């Protein structure tokens, strides 16, 4: 499509439409403007067809709406001079429609998908950083935000709507992006938000308990993640062989690259592979010696913890699979930086080491504590809470993990939303063997301050749950608050 017009946009699905020019594409009738294409989908919370009159009143050029049944697919009506085209299974087609509207941006860059419960953000950031060090103009899309490296704009969801995703990709291409690393959530896969993207590679990090409030059980959660490889254009497949689900998937993906830091690879069983041979943790970070089907080498990194070794190896394997030379990757590896709010370290002379991490699942909290322990000479503190109006089943599990892996536990608030903060804390304490030893302090700023002020200079204080977030949701209010800023101020790193 040289320009955006209704006839060409819908040519694969509907004939006989006028060549009406279209300015922008939107799912939100409130922002629909003159010349726009309004798409009325039936969502989980609202039926967009109810807002067709509002969109027409605002001057839209055309409307695509969910058909009431298969028989109505392709039906064309006119309302007040505005063509309304009805398509069945519109949500499933939306990614392809938006892709055509925005001139297939995923085909105009090297786009890598990263899915899994934990490690998505760090792996995407490492991919973007590393590829940029090798000459690409790189961008990221995900939890922290969307944009070119260094120009990331914060977002609400890990994976935006199908229209948002294509729109953002088109914007990144227009800004000169040649490489993109994108977090792909299970919600995004189930809701077809990335269905029409052409991924150059797709990475699986791991699978552990999360989002069961949405998926119901682990089997459905795994099935949602598997969709990336079973129903999407996934390109090169890079899979973590240290994860039980990953090992199962590798049996169904004969061309995949198997990656391991724990030795779960038999090179004779995998055509392409990469595994750690030796890993040394120290106060400056980690030294990794590895072997692979591309050759061997050694990497020095300032990243903390075993799971970041896994993330780094997954990023390395992905770039090798995409054809980047091993020698160039080794030369640039030491310049990779930790991600904002992901095992991010704050230090000052005579003060405890403070680590801020986004860990908000049982598995992530365990991994964060194990990572911090590797670098801890004194006591290991853990300050954390659990989100309100979310999966209650993980609360006692996280309480048990904090008690087992930390020396001193401080339980506090983390986005209580509309739940009673003390009720959330009680759910966490229920998982502990000796809740009487736990320090409870509802106000998060006070809890973080108290822990850092009481910790000794050889202690490590892990503040888990919020990471990069700069807000606390109490009731329906979004209040300014940042673990990172609080820690930096207390250590005197910033005023």
Curated annotation (Swiss-Prot):
Its EC number is 6.3.2.13. ATP binds at residues 116-122. The keyword Methyltransferase does not apply. It holds the Pfam family Mur_ligase_M. Transmembrane segments: none annotated. Belongs to the MurCDEF family. MurE subfamily. Pathway: Cell wall biogenesis; peptidoglycan biosynthesis. Meso-2,6-diaminopimelate binds at residues 390, 414-417, 465, 469. It catalyses: UDP-N-acetyl-alpha-D-muramoyl-L-alanyl-D-glutamate + meso-2,6-diaminopimelate + ATP = UDP-N-acetyl-alpha-D-muramoyl-L-alanyl-gamma-D-glutamyl-meso-2,6-diaminopimelate + ADP + phosphate + H(+). Keywords: ATP-binding, Cell cycle, Cell division, Cell shape, Cell wall biogenesis/degradation, Cytoplasm, Ligase, Magnesium, Nucleotide-binding, Peptidoglycan synthesis. Carboxylation is probably crucial for Mg(2+) binding and, consequently, for the gamma-phosphate positioning of ATP. This is UDP-N-acetylmuramoyl-L-alanyl-D-glutamate--2,6-diaminopimelate ligase. UDP-N-acetyl-alpha-D-muramoyl-L-alanyl-D-glutamate binds at residues 27, 29, 44-46, 157-159, 185, 191, 193. Its main location: cytoplasm. It comes from Salmonella typhi. A motif (Meso-diaminopimelate recognition motif) lies at residues 414-417. Its cofactor is Mg(2+). HAMAP family: MurE. The lineage of its organism: Bacteria, Pseudomonadati, Pseudomonadota, Gammaproteobacteria, Enterobacterales. It is found in: Cytoplasm. InterPro entries: Mur-like_cat_sf, Mur_ligase_C, Mur_ligase_C_dom_sf, Mur_ligase_cen, Mur_ligase_N, MurE/MurF_N, UDP-N-AcMur-Glu-dNH2Pim_ligase. The modification N6-carboxylysine is found at residue 225. Catalyzes the addition of meso-diaminopimelic acid to the nucleotide precursor UDP-N-acetylmuramoyl-L-alanyl-D-glutamate (UMAG) in the biosynthesis of bacterial cell-wall peptidoglycan. GO terms for biological process: cell division; cell wall organization; peptidoglycan biosynthetic process; regulation of cell shape. GO terms for molecular function: ATP binding; magnesium ion binding; UDP-N-acetylmuramoylalanyl-D-glutamate-2,6-diaminopimelate ligase activity.
């Amino acid at each position: 499509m040289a320009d955006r017009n209704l006839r060409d946009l819908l040519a694969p699905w509907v004939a006989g439409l006028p060549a009406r020019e279209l300015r922008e594409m939107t799912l939100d009738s409130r922002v629909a403007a003159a010349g726009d294409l309004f798409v009325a989908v039936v969502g989980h919370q609202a039926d967009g067809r109810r807002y067709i009159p509002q969109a027409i009143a605002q001057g839209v050029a055309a409307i695509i709406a969910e058909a009431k049944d298969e028989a109505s697919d392709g039906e064309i009506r006119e309302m007040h001079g505005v063509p309304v085209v009805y398509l069945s299974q519109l949500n499933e087609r939306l990614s392809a429609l938006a892709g055509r509207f925005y001139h297939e941006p995923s085909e105009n860059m090297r786009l890598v998908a990263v899915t899994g419960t934990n490690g998505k953000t760090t792996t995407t950031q490492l991919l973007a950083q590393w590829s940029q060090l090798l000459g690409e103009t790189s961008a990221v899309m995900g939890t922290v935000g969307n944009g070119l490296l260094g120009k990331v704009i914060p977002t609400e969801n890990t994976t935006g709507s199908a229209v948002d995703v294509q729109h953002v990709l088109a914007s990144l291409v227009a800004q000169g992006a040649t490489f993109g690393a994108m977090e792909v959530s299970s919600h995004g896969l189930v809701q077809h938000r990335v269905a029409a993207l052409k991924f150059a590679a797709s990475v699986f990090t791991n699978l552990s308990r999360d989002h069961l409030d949405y998926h119901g059980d682990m089997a459905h959660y795994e099935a949602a993640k598997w969709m990336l490889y079973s129903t999407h254009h996934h390109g090169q497949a890079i899979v973590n062989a240290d994860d039980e689900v990953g090992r199962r998937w590798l049996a169904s993906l004969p061309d995949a690259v198997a990656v391991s830091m724990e030795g779960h690879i038999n090179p004779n069983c995998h055509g392409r592979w990469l595994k750690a041979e030796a890993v040394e943790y120290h106060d400056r970070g980690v030294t990794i010696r590895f072997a692979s089907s591309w050759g061997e080498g050694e990497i020095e990194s300032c990243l903390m913890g075993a799971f970041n070794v896994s993330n780094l190896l997954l990023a390395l394997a992905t770039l090798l699979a995409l054809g980047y030379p091993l020698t160039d990757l080794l030369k640039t590896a030491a310049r990779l930086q930790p991600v904002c709010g992901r095992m991010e370290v704050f230090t000052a002379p005579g003060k405890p080491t403070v680590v801020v991490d986004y860990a908000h699942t049982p598995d992530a909290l365990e991994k964060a504590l194990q990572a911090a322990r590797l670098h801890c000479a004194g006591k290991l503190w853990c300050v954390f809470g659990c989100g309100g109006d979310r999966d209650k089943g993980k609360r006692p599990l996280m309480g048990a993990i904090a008690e087992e892996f930390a020396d001193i536990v401080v339980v506090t608030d983390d986005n209580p939303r509309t739940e009673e903060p003390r009720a959330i804390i009680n759910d966490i304490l229920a998982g502990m063997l000796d809740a009487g030893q736990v320090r409870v302090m509802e106000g998060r700023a006070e809890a973080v301050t108290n822990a850092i002020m009481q910790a000794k200079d050889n202690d490590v204080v892990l503040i888990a749950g919020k990471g990069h977030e700069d807000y606390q949701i109490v009731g329906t209010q979004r209040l300014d608050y940042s673990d990172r800023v609080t820690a930096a101020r207390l250590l005197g790193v910033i005023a």
